Structure formats: C-alpha cells, structure tokens
Amino acid sequence: MSSLVSTPFTTATGVQKKLGAPVPLHSFLLSRRQPAAGAGRGRAAAAAIRCAVAGNGLFTQTKPEVRRVVPPEGDASRRGVPRVKVVYVVLEAQYQSSVTAAVRELNADPRRAAGFEVVGYLVEELRDEETYKTFCADLADANVFIGSLIFVEELALKVKDAVEKERDRMDAVLVFPSMPEVMRLNKLGSFSMSQLGQSKSPFFQLFKRKKNSGGFADSMLKLVRTLPKVLKYLPSDKAQDARLYILSLQFWLGGSPDNLQNFLKMIAVSYVPALKGADIKYDDPVLFLDAGIWHPLAPTMYDDVKEYLNWYGTRRDTNDKLKDPNAPVIGLVLQRSHIVTGDDGHYVAVIMELEAKGAKVIPIFAGGLDFSGPTQRYLVDPITGKPFVNAVVSLTGFALVGGPARQDHPKAIAALQKLDVPYIVALPLVFQTTEEWLNSTLGLHPIQVALQVALPELDGGMEPIVFAGRDPRTGKSHALHKRVEQLCTRAIRWAELKRKTKEEKKLAITVFSFPPDKGNVGTAAYLNVFNSIYSVLQDLKKDGYNVEGLPDTAEALIEEVIHDKEAQFNSPNLNVAYRMNVREYQSLTSYASLLEENWGKPPGNLNSDGENLLVYGKQYGNVFIGVQPTFGYEGDPMRLLFSKSASPHHGFAAYYTFVEKIFQADAVLHFGTHGSLEFMPGKQVGMSDACYPDSLIGNIPNIYYYAANNPSEATVAKRRSYANTISYLTPPAENAGLYKGLKQLSELISSYQSLKDTGRGPQIVSSIISTAKQCNLDKDVPLPEEGVELPPNERDLIVGKVYAKIMEIESRLLPCGLHVIGEPPSAIEAVATLVNIASLDRPEDEIYSLPNILAQTVGRNIEDVYRGSDKGILADVELLRQITEASRGAITTFVERTTNNKGQVVDVTNKLSTMLGFGLSEPWVQHLSKTKFIRADREKLRTLFTFLGECLKLIVADNELGSLKLALEGSYVEPGPGGDPIRNPKVLPTGKNIHALDPQAIPTTAALKSAKIIVDRLLERQKVDNGGKYPETIALVLWGTDNIKTYGESLAQVLWMIGVRPVADTFGRVNRVEPVSLEELGRPRIDVVINCSGVFRDLFINQMNLLDRAVKMVAELDEPEEMNYVRKHAQEQARELGVSLREAATRVFSNASGSYSSNVNLAVENASWTDEKQLQDMYLSRKSFAFDCDAPGAGMREQRKTFELALATADATFQNLDSSEISLTDVSHYFDSDPTKLVQGLRKDGRAPSSYIADTTTANAQVRTLSETVRLDARTKLLNPKWYEGMMKSGYEGVREIEKRLTNTVGWSATSGQVDNWVYEEANATFIEDEAMRKRLMDTNPNSFRKLVQTFLEASGRGYWETSEENLEKLRELYSEVEDKIEGIDR
C-alpha cells in the first residue's frame, strides 16, 4: 500500500547544510541577494532570476534577458554599422555561453562590418505568457531566427505561430532537428522546407524518416559531412543555398565559439541585404569527431579505444588505486554538444570523482542521438567481445537511442545486453536552475521526467540521480558535488558486484510487516515470502553464496525470524539481530538529528528497548534477513494531518544504517510488493540530499522483487529508492467455480432447460426462485414472490437472469494461493490465463478472439451475445455458456498436447509446427468437432493458437531467480513492461527489470475506444437508476497502475465525460485536447471531480496538466448550462468563492507532493478511528490538493473549499477494475479513495450518490453498482472454498490473506455503507462457526486469526453487522482463547 507516507514534504531548517552544491549556496541562490544601489543593468538581470517559490508557478523563472547580447553603445567609430538581430530557441542551455562568447567577440572587433544583437530563449520559457510576448516582440525586428531540438508539441506550435508571421520578412530562418511543424519554417534564400514531408527528393525523404531517429541522426551526420562538397560545384542558387544550410548545421553541431562566430558571419553576409558585398570573411567549420572518447586531461579526442587506453596507462597524474589492474572501470556516456560548446564542468567533476575513488573511466560521446554503436565500438574489446567496463553511467539523461525525439528501445536493449553491465542514467537539470529544483516539492520538471526519466527506464536505465545544476545567468552546467559523490559511489558499488566472488558478497534481504504485527511479517502482494526466500537461498547456496546456518524448512525460517529466543515471557518483539546504542546510531546516521522534530531524541519508543535501537532479523552466513520497521504513524494516523514534515523514525533510520554501515551489505534485496522506503517524504522525482529515501538507501545497490502487475508503484521504487525492480508472477488464475447453493442453482437451471416444456417448468422455476433467495441473489436479480403464477416468457427471463448471474460468478477469474519465486505455474495451471488471453480481439496483430470465432460459426456477433446474456435472454445465456465451455475445452486439449507426463511444457514451437495445417489432427479442431462449432474458421484458429503457444511458453518460463542472480553478479537485467499479462502478454516472462510506459503516449486510440463504451454504459445505467436524468457530476479515481495496464483507459473516460478528445502529435505523444461538438456528443458535458492517486501524480503529471487544461477549456466554452455541467457548476462556485471562472473550474486533485493516500486505510487496518466523520476529515485534509495547469511548477496547492464544493455536486462516484488479479477487497486502496458517504454529507439534499464500478477484466465489460461488485467479490473470494482453501495451502501467509479480505470489507462499510449484512454472517459461519476451519486458522497463524476475530467484533460494534448475541459471545471467548494461545507459543 502506498499509504505509508506523509504530509507535504518541506525542507527542514537544518537540511540546507546537507544539500549538494558545487559552490557556497549563495552563489546560485541569486534571488536572495539584494542588488547594490545603482547596480543598473545588473539589477535588471538579478530581477530576471526569481525564486520558483515566489514565481508565477511555472518551472523556470529565468528570463531571456540573461541571454541578450547587444553591441556596445557609444562606439563612435562604428556608428552607422548595420545591426543584425538574431533570435534563437533551444531545448537546453549549453549553447548559451558559447553563443554569448561568440557574439561578444564579434562585437568587440573594431573593424566589424556589423553589430550583432542576439537573444536566446529556452523552449520551456515560452510557456510563460509575458516571456512569449517578449519573444514575439523580439521576432518583429529580427533578421535571423535559429531553432534547435524543439520537440514539445504545444511549445513547437507556439514557436511556429510566432515565427510564421515574420518568416517572409526575415532574412533567414534556420531550424535544426525539431518537430516537422517547426522544420517547415526553414528558409535560406531559395532553400525552403515548407513542403517537408511531401517532396520526393532524397534530401526531404531523409527528413521524413521517423521510425528510427537514431538512424535518422546518423544519416544526418553523414549528409552533413559530404553534401557541401557535392553542392559546391552545382551552379544553381538553390544548390548553393542548400549547401549553406548544411554548412550552418555543421557550424551549429560544432558548437564552439569559433564555429558559431563563423556561422553568424556566413549567414549575415550571405542573406542580410544591408551586408551584401560587405568585406566579411569566414572560415570553414572546425569539425570534431562525430563520436569518440574524450577525457579532460587527454591531448585529443580518440576514435580508437586502444589508443585511449594506451594514453590512460601512461598517465603520470594518477593515484595508486588507478594503477591497480583490478580497479573497476566505469563507462560514461556524454553529450557531444556539451563538450564542443565548452559546457563540460559537470562531466569533468564526475570523471575526477570516479578517479579519486579508484575507478578508471572511459568517457564516450556521440554527435547523433544513437549511442548503441559507440557503446559497442569503445566499451567492448573487439577481439574477445568482452566489455572493458564493469558499469555504464549515462550523463546525458536521454534514452540510449533517439534522444528526445523518437526512440528505438529494442536497439538500445540489444546494445546493453552485449555490454551486460549495470546501466545508470543520471540527470543534469535542463528546465530548472539549481535553486528552482532545490525549492521544488515536485523535484524535476514534468517534461524532463517524461524525456529523461521515463524513456531511459524503457532501456533498463536505473538511478535517476540529479548530478548537475544550471547557473541562471550563464546557463552553464555545474556539478552538485554531494550528488556527484553519491552517483560515483553507487556506480562503483554496482561495478564491485561484477568483480567480487559469490562467497564474499553480503546480501541483506528485507521483508515487510504491515500492519505491524507478528502475524504480518513477510507481507507482499500475491507472494509466499518465506517460501520464496527459502527457495532463493537454497539456489544461492548451490551457486556458492555463504548462507551458513540456513534451517531445513521454510517453516523453521519463519520461526527463527519472528520469535525472540531471548524473551523470558511473551514478547511482541521479533528476533533481535542487533542492538544499536544511541551514540553509535548518531555517529553513523548523518541525518539523525533531523528526525528529532517528529520523534524526539533517540532511541524513541519504536524498534527500541528504551536504551538501544533494535534491528529485527536473523543472519545466515553472509545473508541477513531483516524486517523493515513500519512507517511509524500506523497507530495514530491523525498525527499526519498536523505534522508539517513527516519523517522516518529513529528505528527506521537505524535499520538502514545497520544494513549499510554495520552489516556492510553489498546489495539489499527488498522482497515483494511493497515496503515504505520508497514512499518516505521527499521530492517526487529527482531527489536531493534532503529527501529521506535518498538518505536511507545511502550507497547500497538496491534490488527489489515487485509484482509484475504493479508497474506504477514499481516505478516509484525505481525512482525514489534507486531500485533495480525485478518482476514476479502473480499466482495462476482459475475460474471461481460454484459451491453450495450456487451449485444447486446451476443444476436446477439445467433441469429447467430440459424439462420446461413437459409441464414441470413452473415447479422448477419456483425452486430456482427460493434457492436464489437463500443464496442472497435477490438484490442482484429482481425475483417475484414465491407462488406467483408466471407466463412462460417471464419464467424464461427470470431463469435467464439467475443463470447469467451464476455464470458471472462461476467464470470470474481469481488467483488461487500465493506465488513462490522459482516455481512457475504448470501448463494446466496456465489454462485459465490462456482462456482469458484468447478472449480478447487483438486487431493490431490480426488475431480474433476465440469466443468471436465461435460466435461467427453460428452466425452471431459475440458482442450481441454478451448483451443478450446481460439482459437475461435465456438462449443467449446458454449460447455464451456453450462458447465458454468450448473455448476452455479447446485450449485445455491444446495445452495437454504440448506437455509431457509431468505436466511440463516441452518444445512448444516444434509441437505446434507438427500440429498446424493438419486439419482434424489439430487438437483444438478435434475438440470443437464434438461441439456445435465444428465449422469454425480454421485459418483464424491457427493464427490464434500459434499466438497462444508463444504465450504458454512465456507463462511457464522461470526467469525470476535467474534475473536476481544476474543483478547480484553486476549484470544487465533485461527491461520489460509491467501490467496485466492477459491484456499484454509482453509482460511475460517475469524476471524483467519492470518499467511503466512513456507517459506522453496515453491515452491510446484503443483506450479511447474502450473508454467511450464504458462511459456510455455508465451514463445509461445512472439514467436508469436516476429517473432518466444524466448525472451532473461524477467523482472518480485515477490510478497509476490501471492507466499503465490499459494505456490510459480511465484517463480517456474522464476526457469523454467532459466531451473532449486527445490529439496526438507527429511522434504519437498526447499533450493537447480539442472539444467534441455537442452535436457529436449527443448529451450534456458531465462535470467531474478527479481524485488522482499519489502514484498517478508522480508518474503522470503531464496528464494531470492535460486534464486540468481540458476541464478549464470546457468551462470556458460558450454553451448553455443545461448542456455543459462543468460550466454551470464552475460559474456557481466562482460566485460563491469570489474567484475567476478558471480557478473555480479546478477539478484535478491529489495528495500534497511527496504524500500518498488518504490514510483512511491506515486507520481501518489498525482500528485506530472513532467515527466515520474522522475518516471523512482525513480524506478531505489529505486529498484536497489541486493541480493548476496555469502554474505547473507550483506543485499541489491546498484548495479544500473548492474540493468540497465540487464534491457536493456529485450524483455518482466511480472507480475502475481492470484486472482479475486485484478486486475491491483484495487491497485497501479502493475503499481508501472512496468518497461515497463523504459526498452524501456534503450534498445540500443529503442524498447518497449512486456508486459504480466499471469492470473491464473480461472482454464483456460491465458497469455494476458498488454493492453488486462487493457481493460478487465476497462470493468469488472470501466465501468461496476454492479461494480460501487455495490460500490455506500457503499456510501462515494464507491466513493473513483471509483476514485482510475481511478487514477491507469493513473498510467498504465505513466509507460507503454498501456491504450487505449477509456477507458478514456467511463469513462468520465459514471461518468461526466451522470448528475444523477455526482450529486450522488458529494453529496456522494465531496472530492473524486474532485480528480476524477482532475485525468481526469491530464490524458488530460499529453497526455494520447485525448478529445474535450468541455469535458475539462466542467471538469474545475466542479472542481470549487465541490471546492465551499466543502467550503459550511465545512463553
């Protein structure tokens, strides 16, 4: 649960001393310096640099005036000399100092034929309206415009609009690689690119290539080298203008002050009319290597790695460590433009720091955007094929292939696999100055996160450490020395894993316990943690790791970790591995004093015996298994509402101090999803020394097993705890099946179908109705009173609806049991997963779903069958059952034919090739030939089953242990997407370095299509439940993981509700929306209140910007109120609040930056709340922080009154379920974000809103009420013998899973009141009244069983469960009995 975190992160007073800075802090915190009197121009420049906190809410407060260079005034000898004005726009600031130096030198020449005025803009500055006006004003009298690397669409369009107006008037317009819209502005004499994308000439065809920007860049560089020589001898003006364009590109890529001087001279004399025929001489471009090796102390750039190594070996300035032949070698990837422009101070600092720490370096650079070739050419021994390096650190921040434009991740991954070393991607600040970054609670600018954090992750990049800042005056990069020191130390620590022997390596395995209780040690989603640890350690032992003393069984391992052997009496403590006295703690933990604000002096009362800090766990040889301390606020979550800057407690800090400084781990392995380290307070992305995750993890390489279906929180762990996240499989899914009365109902329906025409129909229907009522189905299916005479068609309809409901229960997928690392599912266990993979159409691969193929066989469309079944049409329900059973049968037969007698998959590819194309011998055809679907399309079936064969191989593959060992050996772990393997089988096999997706790539077209279907069904359902009226407002939740899995479906739902559509740019990135006309929409625009999870906020800040812009755009549309509820409510709220319409239209809310969850779940899980109002206040206090697209750099700002007014208009609340693995009661996130009862309290009429859940876990997407979904969840999981017996097979951890479902059910009662009494009654009958079950639970995990009993009593005490006094008395007796049993165990 990402609920383990704090309130807004604020830098404590003493923290500034810790912040990495290359120079005294005041030298770049310029806004805090008072200008001297009469400072004149210096004052204007100082005023141009304002602190972000006091700024206008944009990220960069630097003004372009710092980049304005004008000819010196008062030079009498140069009066009357023409003035040439040049305006340039660039992505990054490294050209600023080089351009400035070039222009100043030109203007200082006493014989100059022209005076140059140059002003530069960073593209991101153009978001600010005042700056944009200045830009347009500068263009109005400019001679020349230059643009480079303009790849952000909304800003590219602003540049295009401004330059286009002046293009014909200007003397020259030069745009170097940028978006096509801007490239078309190019104009140099007769040379133009206005037809870019349409011309047939090779030159333009080159620019059209978009599929591989790395290849594009390489081709560009070759063209730049050769074309001027060819064009020089062509007589036409057009050829000469094209030649000068290419020369311009050479000068620009050369980047040095000399090159830029000659560039400006060439353009001025060639194209500025006042200078035609002037005596201006310019030299040819000085060409640097396109790619090579650069070292600041080397005499030259090297194109041959052997030459570089020879020079390196003969250096006399090196320390003794560097002369050691076994010294680690770090490869560095650098941007050529920083080197040629002389903006390389940050690179020099990293190289010097690595060498000072005893690591050799090979710093490589490339001029294009493709580093895959240079990494092979310079970092790999051409003879042996082995890498020269032990780790690679990219200092560019960009993806390895493609830079900020179009990436080629497969090409990058192939190159990195050949290197096979850890790959770290560190970041220089691009869009912020150092001061702005330090002051920002968000951390990095969202555009930088998208381009330089998210994209490198797709290559397998780790550890986004900010190592360089930017000077606001000069634009030059400077090293942040503490960050550089950490980056270099961590890189060397990863490299050491490559060099150390297995026997000497030390590993700290960290497990979690949440909520804090002995019954919860080893908490992790879907994972049997101790069985998995035991499996891992057995394997590591075989490999040569020292795990001395490991017990003989996983059960014994649990006992040794969770029981304190030294306790004289019952102890709540776990096994104590180390007692750390306060003096030792303070001397080893540099930030210990900062924790005292929240926790007082150490040792405190958490993980402490009053004198020492206690580290819980157990050591086996060189492996330590430790229990991560809890966040600390669990027992009193209300404290978080009043604590200004939450922090970890002393015990938490002591744990990580022990791991790094005392145990001296070579690596830490966080075991399972998930702990609280990555959710500690600090910047969202791009942390500073003052951020707690950064301080806690220190310099230890972090490997983290994370559930494959949770890429969003895995990404938070990757970014905030510098983790190499390795995915593990969730347990194989099975169909829920039927039991007890539900099974009896199924049999009665079969009887009705065969006997309904024999006269026994009415009698059987009467039995069906009474049995359905006994099964509590009467709330889901409207049933008549028993004994009422029904005509045949009504009998069919009632039976059809009951049949559809039990089919829905029977076919629901549920994970059974818990996964064990190193134990992939057998082939037969994978059948249900394959059936669900086969149930989806995949039009992009021309694969038809199996239900679709079978429905077509009998002349039906599968969507029509789904709809008919939903309505209870008996014939359609029966046909759907036949299709479902035939699908399962065909796939089961196929799987059986690909496995050996042990149930293992053997050589699927060969077996498939022997099956395919042999008609009736194809196993799926053999099975279908016995059904009504005998004529199914063979070709479509072959295509589908070929795909399913590949999926089967992936499902049963076992890479989880292998990838862990690769990481421990300092090798590269292949990256892969996280998500739902049913929607996206590329998630498989697990064991990949899990990543999310390009945040600017969503929502996709497919997601938009699915979203429309769900929104239309939701609105229709609400109209039915609401007297035919549309809801005016829907309050909904956006989750990070869901949007990754579905490529933005719920994001697209919001856009469709308010009636806008996303618009993708040339590169497929979505940064813009446009309104859909009311005619096309066919309904009013629905108002929304959007609660973004903290993880969504971290991962998709660009999409929050998009949503806020969309809502405000809709509020400002001139439309009737009855057709635009956004505008209607915004106008009402503007009047009530006394604010502008735009501000009143604030609808995008989340936690404060660095904070997660409403903490309602913490309160429920720990039973630490008094009444529901307290929970609602907690929700409002923590979730009322708004995002403002007009001030994106301001972070999340508290707007509680706006939040309350918006919620008060909600007619419905809404959430999405997108995966069969996680449902409403599986995790506490869902009820933690549910505002149903809160909305009822805020509404003026006091009416409870309708509550809906969209279920897209199957091809037949549904919209159900919340209460329907809770009932379905209870029937298929908590009360289902198949599910709870599957959990009981996992022993200790299985009991905890059962208890967790009941606790989460109570959570839903607390926030929504949508849990029926019978659910608690049946749960009590199942787990308490059944004596055998009760004994099993108590014996297997008495601590979790105690919590189960306590939760039943709490449900009754809070009025959620009405039951007999006899039941309650039994529970009270049981509670005493289990307390005694626990004391007996511990004594």
UniProtKB/Swiss-Prot annotation:
One Pfam family from the record: DUF3479
- The transit peptide segment here is 1-50
Tell me where on the tree of life, at the top rank, the source sits: Eukaryota
User: According to its record, how does it sit in the membrane?
Assistant: Peripheral membrane protein
Alphabetically sorted, this entry's keywords are:
ATP-binding, Chlorophyll biosynthesis, Chloroplast, Ligase, Membrane, Nucleotide-binding, Photosynthesis, Plastid, Transit peptide
One GO BP on record is: photosynthesis
Look up keyword Disulfide bond and say if it applies: no
Q: Which reaction does it catalyse?
A: protoporphyrin IX + Mg(2+) + ATP + H2O = Mg-protoporphyrin IX + ADP + phosphate + 3 H(+)
GO CC annotation terms, alphabetical: chloroplast; chloroplast membrane; chloroplast stroma
Which pathway is this protein assigned to? Porphyrin-containing compound metabolism; chlorophyll biosynthesis
The subcellular location is: Plastid, Chloroplast stroma; Plastid, Chloroplast membrane
Tell me which InterPro entries the record gives. BchH, CobN/Mg_chltase, Mg_chelatase_H_N
GO molecular function annotation: ATP binding; magnesium chelatase activity
Q: What is its EC number?
A: 6.6.1.1
Q: What does the sequence similarity comment in the record state about its family?
A: Belongs to the Mg-chelatase subunit H family.
Q: How does it assemble?
A: The magnesium chelatase complex is a heterotrimer consisting of subunits CHLI, CHLD and CHLH.
What is the stated purpose of this protein? Involved in chlorophyll biosynthesis. Catalyzes the insertion of magnesium ion into protoporphyrin IX to yield Mg-protoporphyrin IX. The reaction takes place in two steps, with an ATP-dependent activation followed by an ATP-dependent chelation step. May be involved in the plastid-to-nucleus retrograde signaling.
Q: What is this protein called?
A: Magnesium-chelatase subunit ChlH, chloroplastic
